[in-house]
Regions:
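Asp-based, Mg2+/Mn2+-dependent phosphohydrolase catalytic module
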Residues: 1-22, 29-32, 36-39, 43, ...
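Conserved ATPase "switch" residues in P-loop NTPase domains
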Residues: 46
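Conserved phosphate/oxyanion-binding catalytic-loop motifs
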Residues: 57
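Polytopic endomembrane small-metabolite transporters, centered on the Drug/Metabolite Transporter
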Residues: 84-86
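Conserved phosphoryl-transfer catalytic core
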Residues: 49
Length: 344
């Protein structure tokens, strides 16, 4: 995985693909506005194949997300949105029958999905819930985390031989971007409960596979392309699920992170923005001297040095060539002397 799929001529990343599963923040929008070229590129994609939106956000329902996307100009309905609470429901149904009482940490996104499937919702451990589903909401505080711990420890605490009731987390994002900066995410809150109960939850969201499997099942497709801005969730998750992946450099991870990506987190395609979905993607070629060529750019790893043989147009093809050369070398990037120009 990672730029090494067999390709002998330049075709678009959508060649042979029957659906696109796009992340939201950093791919479709940033803050209140859409990212340049995202809306028109995704609407164009939808004219030819399925487009789904995969989000770890557990605080909003699919209808709420779809309304936001439609306001940005996207052709979208609630069924196009796959949320981590929806993926969590399938995990829950495998463990607890509908009609059971479920303790919830989180907001509208989780409660809506539970009620759709006939589960009853509680916020009290004293009511004897059959399972705990934990997701993020800005108002979640110590009281909710403590109550979840009491529910999980009621039948199977740290010193118990009992397995305890099922505990499902929508996602394990350690941080989330908000208007004022980076804030603790659901993974941080799950970790707090873990400290009190001595075990880990089953996780539904990226980079775990249930959310990708839910999307594939819903759209009835076989060869989706996952598009995301984070290597540690979008790309890692796509690779784990056996799906093609493209990282777009409009969000969290940029050139430096992509160059340093470990084998499990390497994308098949590197795009500046979503216009790249519809543009021919250059072939990656390796010359006899070991130099990797992408377009007019050529990069070689010489011992511990990364050498720019030709920077071509000095654009994205240079980054693509450098990634392929570094990844093929098998050497961790911290052990290499990398030209600073590759990071810009």
């Amino acid at each position: 995985v990672g730029l090494f799929r067999a390709r002998t001529e330049a075709t678009t990343p959508l060649e042979g693909i029957d659906a696109v599963f796009a992340d939201l923040d950093g791919v479709v929008y940033a803050g209140a506005g859409s990212i340049p070229h995202a809306v028109e590129s995704l609407n164009r994609t939808k004219r030819e194949r399925a487009v789904g939106y995969i989000t770890n956000n557990a605080s909003r329902s699919d209808a709420s997300v779809a309304q936001h996307l439609a306001e940005l100009g996207l052709d979208v309905v609630p069924g196009d949105v796959v949320t981590s609470p929806q993926a969590a429901m399938r995990l829950l149904e495998e463990r607890v029958e509908p009609g059971a009482l479920v303790f919830v940490v989180g907001g509208e996104g989780i409660v809506t999905e539970l009620e759709k499937r006939g589960y009853r919702v509680t916020r009290s451990a004293d009511e004897g819930p059959a399972a705990v589903v934990q997701g993020f909401a800005p108002e979640v505080g110590w009281r909710e985390l403590a109550e979840a711990s009491f529910a999980l420890n009621a039948h199977g605490g740290p010193d118990s031989t009992e397995a305890g009731i099922p505990w499902i987390a929508t996602n394990m994002d350690w941080t989330i971007p908000v208007a004022r900066g980076i804030a603790p995410g659901n993974g941080t809150l799950v970790s707090a409960v873990h400290t009190a109960v001595g075990r880990f939850p089953v996780v539904a969201g990226k980079p775990e596979t249930p959310i990708f499997e839910e999307a594939k099942r819903r759209f009835g497709v076989e060869r989706p392309l996952v598009v995301g801005d984070r290597l540690d969730t979008d790309i890692l998750g796509a690779n784990r699920a056996g799906m093609a992946s493209a990282v777009v450099l409009t969000g969290i991870d940029r050139a430096k992170q992509v160059l340093a990506a470990d084998a499990a987190s390497r994308p098949d395609f590197i795009l500046d923005d979503l216009r790249g979905l519809h543009e021919p993607y250059p072939v990656v070629e390796t010359a006899r001297d070991g130099a990797v060529r992408v377009g007019k750019a050529r990069v070689r790893v010489d011992g511990r040095r990364v050498v720019i043989v030709s920077d071509g147009d000095g654009g994205l093809d240079l980054l693509r060539a450098a990634c392929a050369a570094i990844w093929q070398s098998g050497t961790k990037i911290h052990a290499l002397d990398v030209p600073a120009s590759l990071y810009s």
